[in-house]
UniProtKB/Swiss-Prot annotation:
Residues 2-15 form a propeptide. Belongs to the heparin-binding growth factors family. PANTHER family: FIBROBLAST GROWTH FACTOR. Pfam families: FGF. The keyword Metal-binding does not apply. Residues 127-143 are annotated as: Heparin-binding. Heparin binds at residue 33. This is Fibroblast growth factor 1. One of its GO terms (molecular function) is heparin binding. It is found in: Secreted; Cytoplasm; Cytoplasm, Cell cortex; Cytoplasm, Cytosol.
Length: 155
């Protein structure tokens, strides 16, 4: 197989009834630490909730380039951002604080590092109680930084 080629297995997809990948659909970001879903509220507050029916947990991930994503709340229209203190907040407009480096880890969870603060290794993270973990308090290996993208519907 040449570099860059993609092979699809239509027969396997039909046989096992696997869903086709669609990155345009909203996702839920489920945090391994405490079982919370990342949420962006209308006032710009970012936290976690276990309530799967909360409309503010539906997030639209869009790629700026390979491995770089914007995370936007579909209900609020606000972008997830990290300020110079490492605090997460919702921004009305996309800016350099809203760009995150998405990485698929060996355990199949994703991590999101602030691109602006990439040299500091500041991750998006949630504490066990659902509150945000400041960037400087996060580091590789913590459960707080592990997120599993899930489909919105429970089907």
């Amino acid at each position: 197989m040449a570099e860059g080629e993609i092979t699809t297995f239509a027969a396997l997809t039909e046989r096992f009834n696997l869903p086709l990948g669609n990155y345009k659909k909203p996702k839920l970001l489920y945090c391994s630490n405490g079982g919370h879903f990342l949420r962006i509220l209308p006032d710009g507050t970012v936290d976690g909730t276990r309530d799967r029916s909360d409309q503010h947990i539906q997030l639209q991930l869009s790629a700026e380039s390979a491995g770089e994503v914007y995370i936007k709340g579909t209900e609020t229209g606000q972008y997830l951002a990290m300020d110079t203190e490492g605090l997460l907040y919702g921004s009305q407009t996309p800016n350099e604080e809203c760009l995150f480096l998405e990485r698929l880890e060996e355990n199949h969870y994703n991590t999101y590092t602030s691109k602006k603060h990439a040299e500091k290794n500041w991750f998006v993270g949630l504490k066990k109680n659902g509150s945000c973990k400041r960037g400087p308090r996060t580091h590789y290996g913590q459960k707080a930084i592990l997120f599993l993208p899930l489909p919105v519907s429970s089907d």
